[in-house]
Amino acid sequence: MFILNNRKWRKLKRDPSAFFRDSKFNFLRYFSAKKFAKNFKNSSHIHKTNISKAQSNISSTLKENRKQDMLIPINFFNFEYIVKKLNNQNAIGVYILPSNLTLKPALCILESHKEDFLNKFLLTISSENLKLQYKFNGQIKNPKSVNEIWTDLFSIAHVDMKLSTDRTLSSSISQFWFRLEFCKEDKDFILFSTANRYSRKLWKHSIKNNQLFKEGIRNYSEISSLPYEEDHNFDIDLVFTWVNSEDKNWQELYKKYKPDFNSDATSTSRFLSRDELKFALRSWEMSGSFIRKIFIVSNCAPPAWLDLNNPKIQWVYHEEIMPQSALPTFSSHAIETSLHHIPGISNYFIYSNDDFLLTKPLNKDNFFYSNGIAKLRLEAWGNVNGECTEGEPDYLNGARNANTLLEKEFKKFTTKLHTHSPQSMRTDILFEMEKKYPEEFNRTLHNKFRSLDDIAVTGYLYHHYALLSGRALQSSDKTELVQQNHDFKKKLNNVVTLTKERNFDKLPLSVCINDGADSHLNEEWNVQVIKFLETLFPLPSSFEK
């Protein structure tokens, strides 16, 4: 796969014609459907007229592409892309998006529109230089001619299709599967060929006012003007906490306030930056586009590459959410007592560290139920018990202190930490806890480094408080933690392999590249982490200058 470095990317944005003239993408100027069209000369089939029409359309498109002299790269190649292109061709039908984006979406066409749709579909995949495969008689088929496609598709009611392209700059976004269905019409209803989450039988009197199956490729959920009960009609924001240990002002403050003793709470590896934030944002743009706004909480200057003019990005300094008496702070526990004070934040938000990276397509349902109940990803095993002890991990002591509050409130004991993964949070619950435990919040807020008497608000207290009060449930999503004391090379390579295979069932929801214990001094660890980040997320996001 051809990957653009920064110099080539700048050239592409500055002068696309020169880029394509000089680059490996030059082959796209000559539309590969020319060879494909040679195989379309099968005129003896019963659908001879329609096949000829398809061939004629493809030939015309080929000539038009030659006039344009190039096909532009595709930034995001997905089901939405093909729906948009089909709408440009005035195709007619409906589409159904699954609640879980790792499942296949469906494109549903009336039987009476089949011939017209197939002409427009073949024209679209030809003009876009896309490769078509589909499952037929239990095997994945690579059709060699329009005749073959028409013969196959006219004999079945539905088919799983795969579209792929060489026009993306990353192999992880170069293909997708969807289901093509042909619906039968009765005088009173339309019958879909397979069941779906809305309704398999669509009564015609229910579509009088919404023009479904009348114009364009429309979302099937438009059978009502109201949101569907499984859909989320609330905004979700994203919050990062970020620090740059190379920031000069931060370094001066750190030297001034750093205690004489060393611990994991003061280790510089905790504050090391490899531009993980850049890659985390790339992963969210690729896999979590449902996010409304991204808040980045920091006491450092924004990185030079970050585009603060992007309307989705808002930089939040500590003094905007924390009192002056608590500043400066170098404690994540302290910062996490105040995230719900971010101005303008939605009641529903996802809290993520910059070392948490998404690995597959996600939507709101991965983090919240449609009724607002949060989804937690607690570890499968318990780890929290006993009393706070000097010298033991600060995250564990923070959880122990939180556990004491939970036991008093709910008369139950808890033991499970949250996995190293994005956390589903609600500001109303955080405000409620702050009001209920003012002394513990205030004490943690004013500790400049993680301390023995901290409470872990987002690391422990929130999740179990929400769970025990009926406002959160455990999720079955898998996550991956990678540390230098693991077989990290094997773990990272496995994620890369599964991503290339688009094996969403086995891919974790996220992977955490977890620094600590002076991991920044481990050269092999640093090399493998950087290689992983650049391999999985090579393309700049819209959040970069």
Curated annotation (Swiss-Prot):
Coiled coil: none annotated. Its EC number is 2.7.-.-. InterPro entries: Stealth, Stealth_CR1, Stealth_CR2, Stealth_CR3, Stealth_CR4. The keyword Membrane does not apply. It comes from the Bacteria. Keywords: Exopolysaccharide synthesis, Transferase. It is an enzyme of class 2 (transferase). The keyword Transferase applies. One of its GO terms (biological process) is polysaccharide biosynthetic process. One of its GO terms (molecular function) is transferase activity, transferring phosphorus-containing groups. Stealth proteins are part of a protein family that is conserved from bacteria to higher eukaryotes. Family members were first identified in microbes as proteins that help pathogens to elude the host innate immune system. Microbial stealth proteins are involved in the biosynthesis of exopolysaccharides. Stealth proteins are predicted to function as hexose-1-phosphoryltransferases. Belongs to the stealth family. Part of a capsular biosynthesis operon and has been suggested to be the polymerase that links individual UDP-N-acetyl-D-mannosamine monomers. In serotype A the capsule is composed of repeated units of (alpha 1-6)-linked N-acetyl-D-mannosamine-1-phosphate. Non-polar disruption of this open reading frame prevented capsule synthesis. This is Capsular polysaccharide phosphotransferase SacB. The lineage of its organism: Bacteria, Pseudomonadati, Pseudomonadota, Betaproteobacteria, Neisseriales.
